[in-house]
């Protein structure tokens, strides 16, 4: 269990004070994958560096497995950092060392005997899919392979928490998915708690159980990923979801001809089993209305499927529209009116 209570990080310069993290409260379940998403400058990198005290909070508490990180002695903090490991966007490998020796490095620092360290490193090489590349140097590896080395090195001391600081930002989409699949596998095998920060909603949707959205140092929205994805509340969250859907439809709306009287353009959001039910056709028949599908999309989250439909209803009375909306709610389908004639 990880808890952040009223965490603040303030930087003081000669001319001004910068509030990088502003009274953040988080509760992260042990064994879960928790994502923090935000645009550049949102404060997410500063936030994650306070989990292992690479940055000390100005105020507030960071508690991991019952330990108040800011209250640990130097030796206690050093021991805790072995259990709260981290991987980085640019890998941070030692270029003069082979794959195997990069993975052995934290074990050497921890004083593990060489034979045991080598055996552990070989096991990790296999776990991350690099068997046969033990003697390769970082310059001989692809970006995805370098990150696999970074992950193996981070696991060397059997951590309980893995922090991922934009770990896939430097990778192409296919390699990103491969690294995300590896993180899922490792979480399941080792019961890790994973906290990752990213600016990509795809990463959140693909592997996270819960998400916090940051802007200007504040957490502006948080909750289960499927819930946040299907029903975003804050403007920033809506933008992330829209970008993930590659949705330019609202821009196109401004170019459409004015709607006829009593016509509607609506967006429906389906989740779980409702994504495969013939709801639109049954409602079209029930209310004897024509429905044009202007746009359709479906996205998978770690815990379910979310579908999106944009519909044009050429004519429906306000009374029938109210019934139409009520029936959608009863079927657990969310509706947003985009335009009304």
From Swiss-Prot:
The keyword Cell wall biogenesis/degradation is assigned to this record: no
Q: Which cysteines are joined by disulfide bonds?
A: none
Annotated ABC transporter domain ranges read 2-241
Where is it predominantly found?
membrane
Q: How does it sit in the membrane?
A: Peripheral membrane protein
Its localization reads:
Cell membrane
Which residues of the sequence carry a binding annotation for ATP?
A: 38-45
> Would you tell me the protein name for this molecule?
Methionine import ATP-binding protein MetN 2
């Amino acid at each position: 269990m990880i808890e952040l209570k009223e965490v603040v990080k303030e930087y003081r310069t000669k001319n001004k004070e910068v509030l990088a993290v502003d009274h953040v409260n988080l509760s992260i379940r042990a064994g879960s994958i928790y994502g923090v998403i935000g645009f550049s400058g949102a404060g997410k990198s500063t936030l994650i560096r306070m989990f292992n005290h690479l940055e000390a909070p100005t105020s507030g508490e960071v508690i991991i497995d019952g330990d108040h990180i800011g209250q640990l002695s130097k030796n206690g903090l050093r021991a805790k950092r072995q259990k709260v490991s981290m991987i980085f966007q640019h890998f941070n490998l030692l270029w003069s060392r082979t794959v195997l020796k990069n993975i052995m490095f934290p074990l050497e620092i921890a004083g593990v005997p060489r034979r045991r360290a080598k055996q552990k490193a070989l096991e990790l090489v296999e776990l991350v899919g690099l068997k046969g590349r033990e003697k390769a140097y970082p310059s001989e590896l692809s970006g995805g392979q370098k990150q696999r080395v970074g992950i193996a090195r981070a696991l060397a001391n059997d951590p309980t928490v893995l922090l991922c600081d934009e770990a896939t930002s430097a990778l192409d989409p296919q390699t990103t998915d491969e690294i995300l699949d590896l993180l899922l596998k490792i979480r399941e095998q080792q019961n890790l708690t994973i906290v990752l920060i990213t600016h990509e909603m795809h990463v959140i949707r693909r592997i996270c159980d819960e998400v916090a959205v940051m802007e200007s140092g504040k957490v502006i929205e948080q909750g289960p990923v499927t819930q946040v994805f299907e029903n975003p509340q804050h403007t920033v969250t809506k933008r992330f979801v829209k970008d993930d859907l590659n949705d330019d439809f609202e821009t196109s709306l401004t170019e459409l001809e004015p709607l006829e009287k009593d016509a509607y353009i609506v967006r429906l959001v389906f989740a779980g089993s409702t994504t495969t039910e013939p709801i639109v056709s049954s409602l079209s028949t029930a209310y004897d209305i024509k429905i044009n599908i202007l746009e359709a999309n479906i996205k998978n989250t770690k815990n379910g499927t979310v579908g999106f439909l944009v519909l044009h209803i050429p004519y429906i009375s306000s009374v029938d529209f109210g019934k139409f909306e009520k029936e959608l709610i009863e079927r657990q389908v969310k509706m947003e009116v985009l335009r009304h004639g």
